[in-house]
């Protein structure tokens, strides 16, 4: 039998369930804004920054150093996600969120100090440490799931996704607009943004600590609930995870290195990059809300495969496009990515429910973070040639995944 991922005792009735939903969405928005804030500023910091021990640490190229700085954060999220989920089951969602958000705030402060002191090793270490505590989305989703049916799960998740996309809109905009004030300033802003999150936790979320700790220790809970074991247990999920890895390599090529593309090909600074990124996130927010309104339809897997194909074509076009067309393609690519993100998790949630929702959604997070780390390292090397090569690689892996998804859908939908 599958072990339950949350305590079996139902939560007490909520007096104001909509207030809780709004508090959780606001918490997710502000937390994600802090996570997204550094993305449009790393390319200008490293590639256009001064020639010193930070941007040319150990004589290495700035593109390589930027790739490593990009890679360590999702690597930290990947490692932290194996701990944060079981901890929230054992000690309560609110308590774990309080600890992780406080630790993230401290991590942003360390990143700001490392930039101010031009200490590249400390910057990389702080980005990894911050990643360890940034994987809060799974905990927030679990919190909303705990309160079903007092909060409708489908509608709550739709609002949560929209809040996350708005966070990805607000964060890059803040980062790009504050970078001219100093390289450390965006990270200080990210830390300040998290302070209202801690206030919301205290006043907006009920105390959900279990009356008694679940049987077994934390390590036993982690072994029981970790997601990677699913690829060993289920050959269908293993096949799907490999396709998802190829697809998210392309997606993360866009997420991580579109700022470098805009810097190299369109000569945009931090503010221009932030504006384009904000437009992309706005498109993703609108597409996510539209996808929630129209639902998944009768053949969600086939539709997800088609959107993956559209994304692949867009990435391949971006690798060849002139600067003006690329600045149109980058925001437009957010639309098929959002529809895919709405369809594929919904289909997996229904198809593999027997494995436990937390583990299945955790597998998607694990694959995404793994591909994020991989493309950050590979892209750091290819970026020394041109960001176009990164988009070409991302488009190729996305195209292979899309073809595989189409065949997979014919067999398993």
Where are each of the predicted segments found?
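Central cavity-lining transmembrane alpha-helices of secondary-active solute carriers
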Residues: 67-85, 278-290
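Helix-to-loop junctions at the C-terminal end of transmembrane segments
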Residues: 79-92, 287-300, 383
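Juxtamembrane intracellular "pre-TM" segments in multi-pass secondary transporters
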Residues: 6-17, 206-241
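Short amphipathic helix-loop junctions that connect adjacent transmembrane helices
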Residues: 40-63, 256-272
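Hydrophobic core of transmembrane alpha-helices in multi-pass small-molecule transporters
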Residues: 107, 120-135, 325-339
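C-terminal ends and interior cores of transmembrane alpha-helices
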Residues: 102-117, 310-321
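Cytoplasmic membrane-interface "Motif A"-like loop-to-helix N-cap segments
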Residues: 90-101, 296-308
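Cytoplasmic helix-loop-helix junction between adjacent transmembrane helices
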Residues: 126-164
């Amino acid at each position: 039998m599958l072990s339950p991922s949350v305590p079996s005792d139902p939560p007490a009735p909520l007096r104001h369930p909509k207030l809780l939903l709004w508090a959780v969405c606001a918490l997710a928005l502000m937390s994600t804004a802090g996570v997204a804030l550094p993305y449009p500023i790393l390319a200008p910091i490293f590639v256009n920054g001064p020639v010193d021990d930070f941007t040319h640490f150990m004589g290495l190229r700035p593109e390589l150093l930027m790739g490593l700085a990009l890679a360590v954060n999702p690597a930290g999220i990947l490692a932290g996600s194996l701990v944060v989920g079981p901890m929230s089951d054992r000690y309560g969602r609110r308590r774990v969120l309080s600890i992780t958000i406080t630790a993230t705030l401290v991590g942003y402060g360390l990143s700001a100090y490392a930039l101010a002191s031009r200490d590249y090793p400390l910057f990389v270490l702080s980005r990894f440490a911050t990643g360890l505590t940034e994987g809060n989305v799974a905990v927030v989703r679990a919190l909303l799931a705990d309160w079903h049916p007092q909060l409708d799960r489908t509608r709550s998740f739709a609002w949560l996704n929209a809040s996350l996309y708005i966070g990805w809109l607000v964060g890059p905009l803040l980062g790009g607009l504050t970078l001219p004030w100093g390289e450390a300033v965006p990270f200080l802003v990210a830390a300040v943004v998290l302070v209202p999150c801690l206030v919301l936790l205290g006043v907006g979320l009920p105390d959900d600590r279990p009356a008694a700790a679940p049987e077994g220790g934390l390590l036993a809970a982690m072994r029981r609930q970790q997601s990677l074991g699913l690829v060993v247990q289920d050959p269908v999920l293993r096949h799907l995870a490999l396709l998802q890895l190829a697809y998210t390599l392309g997606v993360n090529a866009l997420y991580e290195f579109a700022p470098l593309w805009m810097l190299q090909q369109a000569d945009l600074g931090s503010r221009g990059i932030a504006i384009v990124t904000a437009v992309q996130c706005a498109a993703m927010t609108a597409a996510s809300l539209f996808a929630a309104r129209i639902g998944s339809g009768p053949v969600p897997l086939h539709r997800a495969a088609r959107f993956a194909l559209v994304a692949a074509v867009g990435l391949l076009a971006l690798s060849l496009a002139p600067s003006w067309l690329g600045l149109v393609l980058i925001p437009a690519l957010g639309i098929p990515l959002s529809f895919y993100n709405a369809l594929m998790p919904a289909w997996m949630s229904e198809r593999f429910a027997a494995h436990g929702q937390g583990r299945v959604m955790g597998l998607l997070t694990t694959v995404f973070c793994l591909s994020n780390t991989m493309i950050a390292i590979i892209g750091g090397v290819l970026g020394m040639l041109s960001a176009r090569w990164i988009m070409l690689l991302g488009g190729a892996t996305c195209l292979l995944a899309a073809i595989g998804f189409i065949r997979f859908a014919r067999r398993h939908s």
